[in-house]
Regions:
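Short, P/G- and charge-enriched loop/turn segments at secondary-structure junctions
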Residues: 1-5, 77, 98-99, 118
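Conserved N-terminal beta-strand and adjoining loop/helix that marks the start
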Residues: 2-24, 45, 76
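Conserved hydrophobic/aromatic beta-strand scaffold that supports enzyme active sites
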Residues: 16, 26, 88-92, 112
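A conserved beta-turn-beta hairpin within the catalytic core of GNAT-like acetyltransferases
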Residues: 34-38
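The catalytic Nudix box helix
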Residues: 41-73, 114
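Active-site-adjacent beta-strand/loop module that shapes the phosphate/pyrophosphate-binding cleft
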Residues: 77-101
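Nudix hydrolase/Nudix homology domain
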Residues: 100-159, 224, 232-235, 239
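Catalytic beta/alpha-barrel core
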Residues: 142-145, 153-221, 236-242
Length: 242
């Protein structure tokens, strides 16, 4: 996004729809729209007086014929296109939170895809960074060697502290101070940045090398700060550790 773009923000919502196999729904933009043929997570503009959830429900009914019963706020990004400057709020919709058969009501194509193994292209520019974010597991456990371990649609997922990382490790965890001093580790496919308070969170969130944030919560005030950050909207996944 250009920092000099002063155009008004267009408020847009998009849905990350999952099926029972853990796959994500992508659809192509129909003919006649900007970026026709590009793949995206479906959604659309929030109308005046409309809530984000209501807009999400309306757009999916209009475009794909499915009904959304519940949705969880996820990431929030601002992106400048040639035709508009948009604020995109992404919602995750689990397999039991929607119903109906998918219909291409605008003549678009659609496809179920696995996180980390997307086979359709090209992707809409604002949606591209989400592909890496979707590979982050929703639950992680601390292993005996200090790594964070979980699973995604592609199998085992492991995050290793930078100080003990081997050259083949893809996901690296480092403190925000180390990120600011040394930058992105050259071997890292995904950089996790550890923060402990709101100031560190803001510094890490603003750094272009940050792929995932890990916020260690020590008390109630930390928990409140996390809730405020989530309400404001995070551009990258935020993991919380007690």
């Amino acid at each position: 996004m250009s920092t000099t773009d002063s155009r008004p923000l267009l408020h847009v919502v998009a849905g990350i729809i999952l099926n029972s196999q853990g796959e994500y729904l992508l659809s192509s933009r129909p003919a006649g729209k900007p970026y026709a043929g590009y793949w995206e997570f479906a959604g659309g503009k929030v109308e005046a007086g409309e809530s984000e959830t209501a807009a999400l429900q309306r757009e999916f009914e209009e475009e794909l014929g499915i009904r959304i019963h519940a949705a969880v706020p996820w990431l929030c990004r601002v992106h400048s296109y040639e035709h508009a400057r948009v604020r995109l709020r992404f919602y995750r919709v689990a397999a039991d939170q929607w119903s109906g058969g998918i219909q291409a009501r605008e003549g678009q194509a659609w496809s179920w895809q696995k996180a980390g193994d997307f086979t359709v292209s090209p992707m809409l520019p604002a949606n591209g960074p989400l592909l890496k974010a979707l590979s982050v597991p929703t639950e992680l456990a601390l292993s005996a060697d200090g790594a964070l371990c979980g699973e995604n649609g592609m199998g085992a997922y492991r995050v290793v502290p930078y100080a003990s990382a081997l050259p083949q490790e893809a996901n690296i965890l480092l403190p925000v101070g180390a990120l600011q001093t040394s930058g992105r580790p050259p071997q890292a496919e995904s950089v996790w940045v550890e923060v402990a308070d709101a100031n560190e969170y803001r510094a890490a969130a603003a750094h272009p090398a940050t792929d995932v944030l890990l916020w260690r919560v020590a008390d109630g005030s930390d928990a409140q700060a996390v809730l405020e950050a989530l309400a404001e909207g995070c551009a990258v996944p935020l993991a919380v550790a007690a």
